[in-house]
């Protein structure tokens, strides 16, 4: 089947609505919407929930940009895109909870298509979701990865192990020699076997995010915590900032190609702290995190 960008866009708009409704149902606070237009073509809807009952900040962004030609930075690695008009669309979100026992989560699903008369379109899907705990709970990690594995199974036995490995490799801070969190799924350049199958997988990932995340939120949101846990959460959020500004391809591509800065940086935690040469106490729950986030098979 020929790629249907309109069908993908409608799914993404509905996905943004659904996820915002689900997060509001857990939190009680409403999202504020900021619609924006891109001068060069396209626009989006950025939605942010701030200082809710459960979430300190949750941002759910939809964007759809298009143009007559790809930026040179994009065609340098993919010469087949030169001379083609393009559309890029996606939903991306990050949730930063108040409670340090509730992990931060991130999800993204996206579609890209480039066309020119007389030639087949070049298209692909990408996306995934990943979890960044501050305090490790094995049952949460197992639930997260089991949900990821189960949504992948209809698409093949090898899909979950492949995209889990890709996620572990992608969300890695080389300068710290540590993982950002416990991973999940990450895929890109997906265009086989055909459009329908690839689109179905992207939909499964988009819908699977809240199935994976919200039960963990419900389990942890009422746990008592104090200043020590909050300080550790703010310190570990620093890793999130470091990854996004130093290593994340999407953030760098957006900033380098004149994307909408407010939407791109919506993933940043609202509060964060750094501490020179911080060392958690031996045997403390804080010290246990470095082992917990090391790559392993959770299911």
Curated annotation (Swiss-Prot):
Q: One GO molecular-function annotation for this sequence?
A: tetrapyrrole binding
Which keywords has UniProt assigned to this entry? Cytoplasm, Heme biosynthesis, Manganese, Metal-binding, Oxidoreductase, Porphyrin biosynthesis
Show which residues constitute the signal peptide.
none
Annotated segments matching region Important for dimerization? 240-275
Q: Where does substrate bind?
A: 92, 108-110, 258-260
**What does altering residue 106 to L do?**
Complete loss of oxidase activity and absence of manganese ions
What does the UniProt record report as the effect of altering residue 96 to L in this chain? Complete loss of oxidase activity and absence of manganese ions
Which Pfam families did the record assign? Answer: Coprogen_oxidas
- Effect listed in the UniProt record for changing residue 274 to L: Complete loss of oxidase activity
Q: How does activity depend on pH?
A: Optimum pH is between 6 and 7.
Query: Per the UniProt entry, what are the Gene Ontology biological process annotations, in alphabetical order?
Result: heme biosynthetic process; protoporphyrinogen IX biosynthetic process; protoporphyrinogen IX biosynthetic process from glutamate; response to hydroperoxide
Cofactor dependence is on:
Mn(2+)
**Active-site residues, Swiss-Prot/TrEMBL:** 106 (proton donor)
Q: Where in the cell is it found?
A: Cytoplasm
Quaternary structure (record): Homodimer.
The UniProt entry, under HAMAP family, shows: Coprogen_oxidas (MF_00333)
State the family named in the UniProt similarity comment for this chain.
Answer: Belongs to the aerobic coproporphyrinogen-III oxidase family.
Please report the name of this protein according to its UniProt entry: Oxygen-dependent coproporphyrinogen-III oxidase
């Amino acid at each position: 089947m020929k790629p249907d960008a309109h069908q993908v866009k409608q799914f993404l708009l509905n996905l943004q609505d659904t996820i915002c409704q689900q997060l509001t149902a857990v939190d009680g606070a409403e999202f504020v919407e900021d619609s924006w237009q891109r001068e060069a073509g396209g626009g989006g809807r950025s939605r942010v929930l701030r200082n809710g009952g459960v979430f300190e900040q949750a941002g759910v962004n939809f964007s759809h940009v298009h143009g007559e030609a790809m930026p040179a930075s994009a065609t340098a690695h993919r010469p087949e895109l030169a001379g083609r008009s393009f559309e890029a669309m996606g939903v991306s979100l990050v949730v930063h909870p108040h409670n340090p026992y509730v992990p931060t989560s991130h999800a993204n699903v996206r579609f890209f298509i480039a066309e020119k008369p007389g030639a087949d379109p070049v298209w692909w899907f990408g996306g995934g979701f990943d979890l960044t705990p501050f305090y490790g709970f094995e049952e949460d990690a197992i639930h997260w990865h089991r949900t990821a594995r189960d949504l992948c199974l209809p698409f093949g036995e090898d899909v979950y192990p492949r995209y889990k490995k890709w996620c572990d490799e992608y969300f890695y801070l080389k300068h710290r020699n540590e993982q950002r969190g416990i991973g999940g799924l990450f895929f890109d350049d997906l265009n086989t076997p055909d459009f329908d199958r690839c689109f179905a997988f992207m939909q499964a990932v988009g819908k699977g995010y809240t199935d994976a995340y919200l039960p963990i939120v419900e389990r942890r949101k009422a746990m008592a915590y104090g200043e020590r846990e909050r300080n550790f959460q703010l310190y570990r959020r620093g890793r999130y900032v470091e990854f996004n500004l130093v290593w994340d391809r999407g953030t760098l591509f957006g900033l380098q190609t004149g994307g909408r800065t407010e939407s791109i940086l919506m993933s940043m935690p609202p509060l964060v702290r750094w501490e020179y040469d911080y060392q958690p106490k031996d045997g403390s729950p804080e010290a246990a995190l470095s082992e917990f986030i090391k790559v392993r098979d959770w299911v």
